[in-house]
Amino acid sequence: MTKDKSILINNIYHMLSYAFQTLKQETYDDVAVESFDEMYNLLAAILAKGIGLQLKQGLYREYISHQEELTVMRGKINMPGTIKNKLLHKQVLTCDFDELSENNMLNQILKTTVMLLLRNGKVKAKYKDDLKKKMLYFSNVDSIEPTEIKWSLIRFQRNNQTYRMLVSICQLTIEGMLITTDAGNYRLASFVDEQRMCRLYEKFILEYYSRHYPELSVSASQIPWALDDGVGTMLPVMQTDIHLQRGNTVLIIDAKYYSHTTQVHFDKHTLHSNNLYQIFTYVKNRSYQFGEEDNTVSGMILYAKTEEEIQPDNVYQMHGSQISVKTLDLNLPFVEIAAQMDRIVESHFTGVIKAD
């Protein structure tokens, strides 16, 4: 089992399985127990399994608009086109019609992602063979330019919910790995992109606590500003990554996935000042919401541990609140990662019981 930027690749699977609960199903058990030496192989294995399951259910189809010149009417007659045909002495009708088709955006994204993985030399032959077999059922589906995919416009509904995890894996793959060469070809770069891994890291922590600690209220909630006059024009939204609460006890976790957990100035290591300012602001404004009630609101900056020699491990008492700065070592067997996360809860919420 190898590492990708100090994260065991199989641990990335565990992180994905919390972010996307579909991967917790028994049908993915063989992927969960396999040891991966490349991130590309993990992604290929997940997609091969997921696409296979989707094929058993049937590929999603939707109505696609077409315009064709036909000898018999289909759908609606397009008058301008038909008149033009008459003037050119063509005995055909221009027709507009909708056709139920597999050649839609969701299937195009799957095929495009698979084709990128098939062209990558680091993907093992067994995964490529599996993906190639799946692609035989995509003969009527077009590949598209990866850079032209408008992820924010994709909408899921009741009859295509099974695509949600697959498309998310595709987005993670394409956005995190895609580089265009001068020749206009695409190649896959290092998987770990800080910004995208940070989102996965946040989601993983949130979903882990949500699943295993039902006694706690777990959310990524917004905190209102403690305003004296109620005027908050142009103030930024205070959006927490992880907000844990039981009664009047609150822990706000700010999850950070950085290449460097500290900043260096004149050979002196210090904590990232913006991160400290942010968590302190969150804590004090959250505490204000309790009014005159007794409360304990704490904050924690939780960095993904790097290979740097100096790692933060600090607890501060600031203006009546505890602010801690810790690291989560993702380069360990997953059971030990879980133990680290459990200790965080146990140190802030007495008597809390973990659920399986």
How should each PLM-predicted stretch be described?
Residues 1-186, 356:
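Terminal, charged accessory segments of proteins
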Residues 61, 65, 69, 188, ...:
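Generic alpha-helical propensity signal that fires on short helical segments
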Residues 151, 189-190, 267:
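Short amphipathic alpha-helical segments at helix-loop
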Residues 156-160, 186-205:
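A short, highly charged nucleic-acid-interacting micro-segment common to nuclease
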Residues 194-356:
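Catalytic core segments in nucleotide and nucleic-acid processing enzymes
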